Amino acid sequence: MAAAALVAAALVIAPALAPFPTAAPIPAASAACPGAEVAFARGREEPPGVGLVGGAFVNSLRSKVPSMSIGSYGVNYPADVSAAKGANDMSAHIQSMAASCPNTRLVLGGYSLGAAAADLVVAVTQPAFGLTDPLPPGMDQHIAAVALFGNGTRRVLGPVPDFSPAFAGKTIDQCAAGD
């Protein structure tokens, strides 16, 4: 994955990390919450964590928004042949973050098989395709952006906004030439 694509993705997503307008007091638990968090599903066969592409993306995003604390979460799944386990972990993490850190701006991302996991999270609204705990209605309000790299699922489903309009305008889908 070209460094230029990662930098371009960070430039597109950085404005989406502007804080939520809020009239309600921030819960006490939010004091330890990051301003934004990237939940990233690594590519197939990569070791646990956010992976090479995810790490480069998070670092690029941090350099574009240095005034904001940006956490990262490596989706916990085997990264072998199925995206469903990654989608379930990502969905559970998003729901947990929304409950414990309601003002944290969430960025979902994935590379290769991890992009397919993120696709499941944003596309599937009922248990299906191995996703057992889809995001409840309204959860998209906590998601500032979706960044997909090497997303093979796009060839089958099309772009994310086509099947999940709530993410139109806040999704990027980068592929290398020939992907």
Specify the residue positions occupied by each region the protein language model found.
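Residue-identity detector for glycine
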Residues: 15, 35, 43, 49-55, ...
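Serine-dependent carboxylesterase/thioesterase catalytic core
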Residues: 88-172
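Secretory targeting and sorting signals
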Residues: 1-25
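Active-site catalytic motif of lipid deacylating hydrolases and related acyltransferases
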Residues: 30-105, 174-179
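Extended aliphatic helical segments
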Residues: 7, 12, 38, 50-53, ...
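Small-side-chain structural scaffolding
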Residues: 18, 23-24, 41, 68, ...
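Generic structural motif recognizing short loop/turn segments at the entrances and edges of beta-strands
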Residues: 9, 22, 71, 167-170
